[in-house]
A protein has these predicted regions:
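N-terminal pre-ligand scaffold of iron-sulfur
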Residues: 1-59, 73, 86-103
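Short cysteine/histidine-rich metal-coordination sites, predominantly Zn2+-binding motifs
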Residues: 59-65, 78-87
């Protein structure tokens, strides 16, 4: 794997249509398996710092569990709700049965 990528999960641990929390060093990240790919974004809604990994995933939209702000898990772009800023995303790669995240 390229330099800068760290292993964060096994492919089998994140079934299609689901998301999970992962930590890389001190960074909280939500990892999702949607539309045949893996996507990662910062696991914090900027509105009240709620963990997005505890929210609801509907297709490619993750919803904050606190005030229901919605973000596209693939791009981090704000979709709807009380908080209108985007969430940072991370580059993800899959090699074999392992999911890697770029730090």
């Amino acid at each position: 794997m390229e330099e800068g990528f760290v292993p964060v999960a096994k492919v089998a641990d994140v079934p299609p249509g689901t998301m999970t929390f992962v930590a890389v060093e001190r960074e909280r990240i939500v990892l999702a398996h949607v539309e045949g790919g893996f996507y990662a974004l910062r696991d914090v809604c900027g509105h009240r710092n709620a963990p997005l990994s505890r929210g609801r995933l509907d297709g490619c939209i993750v919803e904050c569990p606190l005030h229901f702000a919605q973000f596209d898990i693939r791009t981090g772009k704000y979709v709807d709700g009380p908080y209108s800023a985007d969430v940072p995303i991370y580059e993800v790669r899959v090699e074999g049965d392992t999911v890697y995240l770029k730090r």
